[in-house]
C-alpha cells in the first residue's frame, strides 16, 4: 500500500470537495490515458508472453494420442454433463428423460413466482429458494457421482443394495 498514491486528506480543497459529496473522481490520476494506454497493454502483453513462454519452454501432451481402433468400453461425457447423462442413462423412456431435463430449468424459473418476498437478500428469509438450491445441489452431486459408476450401482452409489 505504500506504493499507491494516497489522497492528502489535510488539503482544504479536497476536504471541501469531499464535504460536497464529490469523491474519487476529483482526485488522483485519470484513467485515460495513463491506465488505458500504458498499464493495461503492459499487463495484457505480459500475460500473453508468460503463456507463450510456458508453452514453448514446457510443452506437454494433453493426453495419449488417439487410437481409432481401440475405443473404451463406456464413453463418458465431460464432467459437467454427468447429471444429465445419468438421467438419460437410468430413465427407460428417452422422451421422459428429455422432459425431466427440460423440467429442471422450468422449475427454477418458477421459484421467484412461488416466493414473492424477493426484497430480502438473506437466504434464511427465502426458504423456498434456499430449499430448492440445497436439494438441487444434492441431487446434481448424487447424479454426477452416479454417472461415473456402473449402471447397476449408479442410483445407489453402491451404498446399499436394491433387489
UniProtKB/Swiss-Prot annotation:
The chain crosses the membrane at residues 36-56, 95-115, 131-151. GO terms for cellular component: chloroplast thylakoid membrane. It comes from the Eukaryota. It is a multi-pass membrane protein. It is found in: Plastid, Chloroplast thylakoid membrane. One of its GO terms (biological process) is photosynthetic electron transport chain. Belongs to the cytochrome b family. PetD subfamily. This is Cytochrome b6-f complex subunit 4. It comes from Drimys granadensis. The lineage of its organism: Eukaryota, Viridiplantae, Streptophyta, Embryophyta, Tracheophyta.
Amino acid at each position: 500500500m505504500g506504493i499507491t498514491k494516497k489522497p492528502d486528506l489535510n488539503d482544504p480543497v479536497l476536504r471541501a470537495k469531499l464535504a460536497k459529496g464529490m469523491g474519487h473522481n476529483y482526485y488522483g490520476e485519470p484513467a485515460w490515458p495513463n491506465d488505458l494506454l500504458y498499464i493495461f497493454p503492459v499487463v495484457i502483453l505480459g500475460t500473453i508472453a508468460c503463456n507463450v513462454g510456458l508453452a514453448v519452454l514446457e510443452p506437454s501432451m494433453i493426453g495419449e494420442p488417439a487410437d481409432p481402433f481401440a475405443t473404451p468400453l463406456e464413453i463418458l461425457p465431460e464432467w459437467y454433463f454427468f447429471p444429465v447423462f445419468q438421467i438419460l442413462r437410468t430413465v427407460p423412456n428417452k422422451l421422459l428423460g428429455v422432459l425431466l431435463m427440460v423440467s429442471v430449468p422450468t422449475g427454477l424459473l418458477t421459484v421467484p413466482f412461488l416466493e414473492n418476498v424477493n426484497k430480502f437478500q438473506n437466504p434464511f428469509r427465502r426458504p423456498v429458494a434456499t430449499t430448492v438450491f440445497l436439494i438441487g445441489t444434492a441431487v446434481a452431486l448424487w447424479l454426477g457421482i452416479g454417472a461415473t459408476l456402473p449402471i447397476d450401482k449408479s442410483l445407489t452409489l453402491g451404498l446399499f443394495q436394491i433387489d
